[in-house]
Amino acid sequence: MEFTQQNANTNTIISVDESSITISNSILSRPCFVSTNNASEVSIKNLGEIGKEFLFTLVGKDPIDLLIIGTGNSPKFLSPKQQIELSEFGIGVECMNNSSACSSFNLLLGDLRKVGLLLL
């Protein structure tokens, strides 16, 4: 899938495929985390591994108001326990398929929102 919107000062998503993501002239293997000014590959492999400790390491680098989690070709959702844990950070969390997650990330980034994307 190709995306065209791009801002030189942020990590805009250019394209994404089954194993990688291209952002502003960089390529990352999935799974990865992308925010306005930071991007890194992560060791987490599935939704069940997401918790407070994992989120703390991500948002410490670049504060965000919303975390979008791309869960693959079909949407999967956090457990109620995970939702409660993550709500303690005061960050909104949305889970959706990767295509929707990438589109939403670029849209919110264009609106100057503090958004992060975790692509599994």
Regions found by a protein language model. Give the residues of each.
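Short active-site-adjacent helix-start/loop capping segments
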Residues: 42, 75-78, 103-104
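Mid-chain, well-packed structural core segment of small domains
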Residues: 58-94
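Beta-hairpin (beta-strand-turn-beta-strand) motif
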Residues: 71-74, 98-99, 120
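Non-catalytic interface/targeting segments
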Residues: 1-52, 110-119
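A short, acidic, amphipathic alpha-helical segment used as a generic capping/interface helix at domain edges
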Residues: 50-60
